[in-house]
Amino acid sequence: MSTIHVDVVSATESLYSGEVLCVFAPASTGELGIYPKHTALLSILKPGEVRIETDKGIESIYVSGGIVEVQPDVVTIFSDTAIRANDLDEFKVLEAKQRAQDEMDNSIDTQDISATQAALSESMAQLQMINKMRGKKC
């Protein structure tokens, strides 16, 4: 079976490097499905789930946004923050979401609102992954 090499890299570490059957990433225009021999492209990522499918199963990684570079035999995902789905802490995510909502309610500066909206978007994407994982386990 044909494979494609995938690297997922954050600002602090390499989270994944290996041969996969396919990878799905949250592009700014919608979910991007990448298979071996894919056409070369460069796309912006929004906060969400990167799903890596191998012959052993599926691995999920949260990315806070970033860039995906696709070549026919290599996919590289760069993100400031990348966290394995199993390492997401629901309590911390809920705290961050509440903090962002409180800041939105109390802020009048448009720059503050913009940054707070980004933080809220990241928290919501993380919660969506946590809830999806919980659904898989039941």
From Swiss-Prot:
<keyword id="KW-0066">ATP synthesis</keyword>
<dbReference type="GO" id="GO:0005524">
    <property type="term" value="F:ATP binding"/>
</dbReference>
<keyword id="KW-0406">Ion transport</keyword>
<dbReference type="GO" id="GO:0046933">
    <property type="term" value="F:proton-transporting ATP synthase activity, rotational mechanism"/>
</dbReference>
<keyword id="KW-0375">Hydrogen ion transport</keyword>
<protein>
    <recommendedName>
        <fullName>ATP synthase epsilon chain</fullName>
    </recommendedName>
</protein>
<dbReference type="Pfam" id="PF00401">
    <property type="entry name" value="ATP-synt_DE"/>
</dbReference>
<keyword id="KW-0997">Cell inner membrane</keyword>
<comment type="subunit">
    <text>F-type ATPases have 2 components, CF(1) - the catalytic core - and CF(0) - the membrane proton channel. CF(1) has five subunits: alpha(3), beta(3), gamma(1), delta(1), epsilon(1). CF(0) has three main subunits: a, b and c.</text>
</comment>
<keyword id="KW-0813">Transport</keyword>
<dbReference type="GO" id="GO:0045259">
    <property type="term" value="C:proton-transporting ATP synthase complex"/>
</dbReference>
<keyword id="KW-0472">Membrane</keyword>
<keyword id="KW-1003">Cell membrane</keyword>
<dbReference type="InterPro" id="IPR036771">
    <property type="entry name" value="ATPsynth_dsu/esu_N"/>
</dbReference>
<dbReference type="InterPro" id="IPR020546">
    <property type="entry name" value="ATP_synth_F1_dsu/esu_N"/>
</dbReference>
<dbReference type="InterPro" id="IPR036794">
    <property type="entry name" value="ATP_F1_dsu/esu_C_sf"/>
</dbReference>
<dbReference type="InterPro" id="IPR020547">
    <property type="entry name" value="ATP_synth_F1_esu_C"/>
</dbReference>
<dbReference type="InterPro" id="IPR001469">
    <property type="entry name" value="ATP_synth_F1_dsu/esu"/>
</dbReference>
<keyword id="KW-0139">CF(1)</keyword>
<comment type="similarity">
    <text>Belongs to the ATPase epsilon chain family.</text>
</comment>
<dbReference type="Pfam" id="PF02823">
    <property type="entry name" value="ATP-synt_DE_N"/>
</dbReference>
<comment type="function">
    <text>Produces ATP from ADP in the presence of a proton gradient across the membrane.</text>
</comment>
<dbReference type="GO" id="GO:0005886">
    <property type="term" value="C:plasma membrane"/>
</dbReference>
